[in-house]
């Protein structure tokens, strides 16, 4: 067994054993630590090596804090590293800025004068890495339903193709309705202003059945087939079937431009 796989197995095996000892479900654990069930499932399934709420998880499961940190570090990620958006901003605030001018090299008399000049010195600020919010709380079911209530589940790195796209976001794939195209636990990155084309994978949002009770839009990840005169037509892979919504039901159709566990 690969060393990293062994360490990840130690983490996931310990979490599973402690959860069973505690007599609670992943859903209940997620509720107690203020995380989505998807985020907790990613950790238990080995798709994530750490969590922003690792101390709370250790406390709820009766794991020594130092042991918890050690297992996560062995699995490939030190939980003490800055990973949250607020933490990243705090980290950037203390980065030194190269404000000292570059040293000037004096022209020596015996050397020929250069026939080109160097431009004025500029204050080179460190490039700030953009993060995108992960939206859509998984509901589950055969169709892989989500709820888009505005809650941010996590933050992920922004790919270059979305750096200048306002309101771009990501979604964690849940369920198997789009296997083999997407598998549970993968991340998809979404372009909210690009028109979808036939064959594109998309994130769609649908008005709730009863908007009067203030329910948020429902969402799905499907393949875009097209529009008819009065319907949106989509394709699902597993089980294979066509899905249709009336135009009045549709809130948005956003194409997925990138997918994978890592990019």
Curated annotation (Swiss-Prot):
<dbReference type="InterPro" id="IPR010982">
    <property type="entry name" value="Lambda_DNA-bd_dom_sf"/>
</dbReference>
<dbReference type="InterPro" id="IPR036286">
    <property type="entry name" value="LexA/Signal_pep-like_sf"/>
</dbReference>
<keyword id="KW-0805">Transcription regulation</keyword>
<dbReference type="InterPro" id="IPR015927">
    <property type="entry name" value="Peptidase_S24_S26A/B/C"/>
</dbReference>
<feature type="DNA-binding region" description="H-T-H motif">
    <location>
        <begin position="26"/>
        <end position="45"/>
    </location>
</feature>
<protein>
    <recommendedName>
        <fullName>Repressor protein C</fullName>
    </recommendedName>
</protein>
<keyword id="KW-0678">Repressor</keyword>
<dbReference type="GO" id="GO:0007165">
    <property type="term" value="P:signal transduction"/>
</dbReference>
<dbReference type="GO" id="GO:0003677">
    <property type="term" value="F:DNA binding"/>
</dbReference>
<dbReference type="InterPro" id="IPR001387">
    <property type="entry name" value="Cro/C1-type_HTH"/>
</dbReference>
<dbReference type="InterPro" id="IPR039418">
    <property type="entry name" value="LexA-like"/>
</dbReference>
<keyword id="KW-0804">Transcription</keyword>
<feature type="domain" description="HTH cro/C1-type">
    <location>
        <begin position="15"/>
        <end position="68"/>
    </location>
</feature>
<dbReference type="Pfam" id="PF01381">
    <property type="entry name" value="HTH_3"/>
</dbReference>
<keyword id="KW-0244">Early protein</keyword>
<dbReference type="Pfam" id="PF00717">
    <property type="entry name" value="Peptidase_S24"/>
</dbReference>
<keyword id="KW-0238">DNA-binding</keyword>
<dbReference type="InterPro" id="IPR000488">
    <property type="entry name" value="Death_dom"/>
</dbReference>
């Amino acid at each position: 067994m690969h060393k990293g796989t062994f360490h990840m197995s130690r983490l996931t095996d310990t979490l599973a054993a402690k959860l069973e000892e505690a007599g609670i479900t992943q859903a209940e654990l997620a509720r107690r630590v203020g995380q989505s069930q998807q985020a907790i499932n990613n950790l238990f399934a080995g798709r994530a090596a750490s969590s922003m709420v690792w101390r709370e998880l250790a406390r709820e499961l009766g794991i020594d804090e130092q042991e918890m940190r050690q297992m996560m570090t062995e699995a490939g990620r030190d939980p003490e590293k800055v990973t949250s958006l607020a933490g990243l901003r705090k980290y950037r605030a203390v980065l030194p800025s190269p404000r000292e001018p570059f040293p000037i090299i004096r022209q020596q008399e015996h050397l020929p004068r250069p026939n080109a000049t160097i431009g004025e010195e500029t204050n080179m600020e460190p490039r700030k890495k953009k993060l995108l919010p992960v939206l859509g709380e998984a509901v589950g079911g055969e169709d892989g339903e989500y709820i888009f209530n505005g809650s941010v589940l996590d933050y992920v790195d922004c790919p270059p193709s979305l750096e200048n796209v306002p309101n771009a976001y990501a979604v964690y794939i849940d369920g198997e309705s789009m296997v083999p195209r997407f598998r549970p636990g993968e991340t998809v990155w979404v372009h909210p202003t690009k028109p979808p084309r036939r064959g594109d994978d998309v994130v769609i949002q649908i008005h709730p059945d009863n908007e009067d009770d203030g329910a948020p839009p429902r969402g799905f990840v499907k393949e875009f087939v097209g529009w008819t005169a009065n319907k949106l037509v989509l394709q699902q892979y597993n089980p294979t079937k066509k899905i249709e919504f009336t135009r009045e039901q549709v809130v948005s159709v956003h194409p997925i431009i990138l997918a994978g566990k890592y990019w």
